Amino acid sequence: MTKLGYQPKILLPEGEFFRFEILSADIEDGEYGYQLGLELKTLGGKHTGHIFKDWSKISGDEDDGLFIKEGTKAEELVRAVLGEEADLEDLDTDALEGGRFMARVAVSQNGKRNRVDFGSIGRIPAEDPPF
């Protein structure tokens, strides 16, 4: 016989800013088309170590393949991690893994998961203490 424990769902508080590390980055093709899927871990504070998944829409077609459109959440995330001058023409998702950024957290419309709030994503200031 194997005993199982129980872990209640934990949601980060909506509207608060957190610092994140990207544990993994993958392109996923699902119900909402192609998306950049990021597994994120919170850094610092009482919620340190909390892990959740966030998705950002990416575009694709037969002629151009997959690409990040200007002005999207995916672009905002990549530039926060790799810098404003990052070359988005030939990006490998592996380059995002281990990257860090800060953003405001929101809760999905159905109240079941956290998400990173588009428009709030940025670089962690250089003067911030290490984690």
What does each of the following model-derived ranges do?
Residues 1-131:
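Short beta-rich binding modules
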